[in-house]
Structure formats: structure tokens, C-alpha cells
Amino acid sequence: MKIISCIEELRDHLRGQLRTAFVPTMGNLHDGHLSLMRLARKHGDPVVASIFVNRLQFGPNEDFDRYPRTFQADVEKLEKEGVYILFAPTEKDLYPEPQEFRVQPPNDLGNTLEGEFRPGFFSGVTTIVLKLFSCVQPSVAVFGKKDYQQLMIVRNMSKQFALPTEIIAAETYRAEDGLALSSRNMYLSAEERAEAPALFKSLNAVANEVRSGHLDIFQLERQAMADLSQRGWKPDYISIRKRSNLQPPSAGDMAQGEKLVVLAAAKLGATRLIDNLEI
């Protein structure tokens, strides 16, 4: 595996490749990330991964400096997965001057759910993804469904900018007890880790109610948040949305069998967890 930080060197190595598959990450890789590499390999060759902790997507009170950096361990994992190039730029490589041009997702996608609680987050995400796409110029890129809103926004960005990159969605990788794998799970205490699967159980309970014909989504959302609060969580949202555009479904949508997804974000102790489940 080649480790490259220079954009021009990366382009030189990839010039002439017909179907490069790309997986962007912020490092601290776990089995969920590695499942993305395997899916990428099914859709393209060579596989390029990136590791870059993107300052632009962290808010002023978020954990940029605290975010775990495990570069050498990440390298070993990627080598075992047969990744061809690890693109590991420095901030100076990607931001040689202040990034004054930013991508701004549309309000109905970018300022709801995560965007409401993390202002500017999706602008930071889409700006770095667009820049990484420019560097790698992939035919396909793999994003996990765990970050469902991010996946939808990147997919829409790629479509609306007519980028020659197909966005592939990977299923959420879960521990045996249902907890979605996340780099932030390492912040959980042993007691919190034992409680953490309750978030996915809550999503399943909501989904089962919808499947059984319960159409009062606001009541379902309120009850699910109240149940988590009673267990010691601090929920930001549990919200049922249309898969197509992440807007709340109307009564007509519900009656006509619109495809839905229920999304959640909640703090357990000091750790904020997100998850979702398609209905």
C-alpha cells in the first residue's frame, strides 16, 4: 500500500485508472470502516482510502483535538484489506490557504436533524468531500448508512454538481448487541456501553409501530424520546422522515406507504451517539 500526502503525487499514481473506488475517513478505523473498504473493492479497482480529520466540520465546542488519531494501527488495517493507496494529507496539503469557498447544502437537507444541532457541520463535510473528490477523481465512493443524512447530502451534491462519481451506500455495521459501530464508542464507560444498545432498540420499537399501522408519528417520536430520557439519556431528536428527501411525511405519505427512515441522536453521559433505521 502506498501512503501519499501530496495531491499531485496522488493524481500521478491514479492517472489512467478506469474505475477508482474511494472511501473517505477520519481514521480511528474499526470494523465498520473496513466493511466499507470491502464493499468498495466490489465496485471498483483500485481502492483508495483517505484519512483526514477535517477541522471544518467540528463546531467550536466539539471534539476536534480530542478526536482519536491512531494512524499506524489504521495503516495496518488498510494494508490487510488490500487498499492500494492511503491518501493522508496534512492540513497544509488540503488547506494551503484559508478555505473561503464553501459548499452550502440546501436548508431543507442541511439545517434539519444533525444540521439543527451542529450548525455548519454539513457545509464542512461537503466542502472536504468535494475537495477529496477533486483530488482522487473516483468513479465510485462508498459512504455508510450510519451517517444517513450525510449520505443523502453527499449523494445530492454529486448529482447536482454532475460529478462523475457514483455514491454507494453501505449498510450500518453493528456489534452483536445492535450498537452501531462508531469511533466515538470508545468514549463510553463500561456502564454506558452496556446501556448504549437501547438507542437501536428504541428505533426498532418506533419502526415496528409504524409497520403495524400507527400513523401518529409525533406521538411515536415523543414517546420514544421520553422513554430514552427515563433511562438517563439526553435525546436531541428521534424523527421519522421520508427516505427520499428527509422531510417529515404527511398523513397521505403514511397512508400510501412512503418509504421512511427513523433517525436519532442522543447523549449518553458525555458521548453523543447517532443511529437510524429504514422502515
UniProtKB/Swiss-Prot annotation:
Q: Which domain of life is it from?
A: Bacteria
- Binding sites annotated in the UniProt record for beta-alanine: 57
Q: Write out the catalysed reaction.
A: (R)-pantoate + beta-alanine + ATP = (R)-pantothenate + AMP + diphosphate + H(+)
Q: Please give the GO cellular component terms listed in this UniProt entry.
A: cytosol
**Pathway of this protein?**
Cofactor biosynthesis; (R)-pantothenate biosynthesis; (R)-pantothenate from (R)-pantoate and beta-alanine: step 1/1
Give an example GO molecular function.
ATP binding
Keywords associated with the record = ATP-binding, Cytoplasm, Ligase, Nucleotide-binding, Pantothenate biosynthesis
Q: Which cysteines are joined by disulfide bonds?
A: none
Q: Where, per UniProt, does this protein localize?
A: Cytoplasm
- Record: residues binding (R)-pantoate: 57, 150
Record-listed ATP binding positions: 26-33, 144-147, 181-184
> Carries keyword Ubl conjugation?
no
Quaternary form?
Homodimer.
Role: Catalyzes the condensation of pantoate with beta-alanine in an ATP-dependent reaction via a pantoyl-adenylate intermediate.
HAMAP family registered for this protein in UniProt = PanC (MF_00158)
Query: What is the protein name for this chain?
Result: Pantothenate synthetase
